Design a protein with these regions (language model features):
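Beta-strand-rich domains and repeat architectures in extracellular enzymes and scaffolds
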Residues: 20-64
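Short, intrinsically disordered, low-complexity segments enriched in Ser/Thr and Pro
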Residues: 59-79
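Surface-exposed loop/turn elements that mediate protein-protein interactions on large endomembrane-trafficking
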Residues: 39-52, 74-87, 106-122, 143-158, ...
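Short beta-strand elements that form the blades of beta-propeller/WD-repeat-like
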Residues: 26-33, 66-71, 97-103, 133-140, ...
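Bacterial N-terminal signal peptides
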Residues: 5-16
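Recognizes the extracellular SEMA beta-propeller fold with strongest preference
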Residues: 93-96, 102-104, 112-113
Length: 234
């Protein structure tokens, strides 16, 4: 646990020092590799490094500029501790120092704060794909849409056919052969077939898992880019 806490502190810092070279390496975020190992991503755009495994047996993880949460089989782990949770993976919607969490195996929503979970009485219809405060991306028989906890519709995403990630002020989603980043009234598309998952890697990047590799998608407006990550791809 101590090693994990130190790693989280490093990820939240502005820079890391790469001990072997003495070079300051900016922290990008975290990914879960094909073995279920949590690994830090460091470097600069187009030149990334995957750090050593910090935790094994990870089913899900998400990071923002303030918070990283990890789901093992039966716990949610943070930089400050851990709490018991339903078995299986989790979908995280991070907001400041809190998060909304969805547990697919029991179809239950909860609010995470200070290493405790409060069950929510949300009864959202359809397959939950992503969460942000008070909004949920779901797949239903008529397609993918964003809804409120009472199931009222906010917006349809007619182009989406694969994974979806709700951002604070936008959305990333997959079509059959593209990744679409939509925010600030604009849209950027990248070629990417066979997308399996889209997760929050850090404050400025999301992780795209597709056909045996992981990409880092930079989401900063005006600097949108898609980069292939090195190393242990799924």
């Amino acid at each position: 646990m101590r090693r994990l806490l130190l790693l989280f502190c490093g990820v939240c810092a502005a820079v890391h020092t790469w001990a072997q070279s003495g070079i300051e390496v900016p922290a990008i975020g975290m990914i879960v590799d094909s073995s279920g190992d949590l690994r830090p991503v460091q470097g600069v755009a187009g030149s990334f490094l995957l750090g050593p495994t910090s935790m094994s047996g990870v089913l899900s993880a998400a990071c923002s500029d303030q918070l990283c949460l990890i789901k093992t089989d039966s716990k949610i782990v943070s930089a400050t501790g851990e709490t018991d949770a339903p078995t299986g993976p989790a979908i995280f919607g991070l907001s400041g120092d809190e998060a909304i969490v969805f547990f697919p195996e029991v179809h239950t929503f909860a609010r995470w704060h200070n290493d405790s979970l409060e069950t929510l009485d949300w009864a959202v219809e359809g397959d939950v794909l992503s969460i942000r405060p008070k909004e949920i991306a779901v797949r239903r028989h008529d397609g993918i849409s964003i809804v409120r906890p009472d199931n009222s519709a906010i917006e349809f995403i007619p182009d989406a056919s694969g994974p979806v990630l709700l951002l604070a002020k936008g959305v990333v989603f997959a079509t059959k052969d593209q990744i679409v980043l939509r925010q600030d009234g604009g849209e950027v598309r990248f070629a990417s077939a066979g997308t399996q998952s889209i997760t929050a890697m850090g404050a400025h990047y999301v992780a795209i898992r597709a056909r045996g590799v992981i990409y880092a998608l930079r989401i900063d407006p005006g600097r949108e880019s898609l980069f292939l990550l090195p190393g242990n791809a799924p």
